[in-house]
Curated annotation (Swiss-Prot):
GO terms for molecular function: rRNA binding; structural constituent of ribosome. InterPro entries: Ribosomal_uL4 (IPR002136), Ribosomal_uL4-like (IPR013005), Ribosomal_uL4_dom_sf (IPR023574). GO terms for cellular component: ribonucleoprotein complex; ribosome. PANTHER family: 50S RIBOSOMAL PROTEIN L4, LARGE RIBOSOMAL SUBUNIT PROTEIN UL4M. It comes from Ureaplasma parvum serovar 3 (strain ATCC 700970). Residues 60-72 have a biased composition (Basic residues). This is Large ribosomal subunit protein uL4. Keywords: Ribonucleoprotein, Ribosomal protein, RNA-binding, rRNA-binding.
Length: 211
């Protein structure tokens, strides 16, 4: 079991939470993490790049010079690929799929590894259950960050569905990223300096890995 410090919504220490060790690994697997982040980055590529081939470049319909008796190499168009302003041979077209396959077990191993790194570095905190604000308030979330000594830190706040007011309250905080527990990726975890996870999210993660 791992012990996580839970904070109240005002940013002060509330209690300790024992989290199942199934969420962590003994030794973080760097290759699994690398593969997961690489696949996530690749999946965001839209593949809208498009170059023009010889037949698509404007102009070049007239033969530059006659075929014979000029002393120059024969050519049929000024848009041939070896000419300046010519088409591109085998250039990228917008039908390429950049998605990379990562097995589910590898993705889970990568996620556990990222959680383990944050835990070992002391960069993982919790948020007590039922901590959503009554109304959206950026000021209260600023107080939370200040009281928790998280100023000038890139904070990842992992919440559950019924924490909508906290989500709205952090929209204007530049260094705070708020995501639902099932939207968090390995890249999100590694990009953040500190990860604050809602108590309900720990329960959901534990239920997920136990399947």
């Amino acid at each position: 079991m791992a012990k996580i410090k839970l904070l109240s919504i005002d940013g002060n220490f509330a209690k300790e939470l024992e989290v199942t060790s199934d969420l962590f690994v003994e030794v973080p697997h760097k290759q699994a993490m690398f593969d997961s982040v690489l696949a996530e980055n690749a999946a965001e590529r839209q593949g809208t790049h498009s170059t023009l081939t010889k037949g698509e470049v404007r102009g070049g319909g007239k033969k530059p010079w006659r075929q014979k008796h000029t002393g120059k190499a024969r050519t049929g168009s000024t848009r041939n690929p070896h000419w300046t302003g010519g088409g591109v041979v085998f250039g990228p077209k917008p039908n390429r799929n950049y998605n990379l396959k990562v097995n589910a077990k590898v993705r889970l191993l990568a996620f556990k590894s990222a959680l383990t790194i944050k835990l070992n570095e002391g960069k993982m905190l919790g948020l007590v259950a039922n901590s959503d604000l009554e109304t959206p308030s950026t000021k209260k979330m600023v107080n939370f960050i200040n009281n928790a000594n998280l100023e000038n830190q890139k904070v990842l706040l992992v919440i559950v569905d019924n924490f909508s007011n906290i989500k709205k309250s952090t929209n204007n905080l530049q260094k705070v990223t708020t995501k639902l527990w099932y939207q968090v990726s390995v890249r999100d975890l590694m990009h953040a300096n500190v990860v604050v996870v809602a108590e309900e999210a720990f329960t959901n993660y534990a239920r997920k890995v136990s399947k």
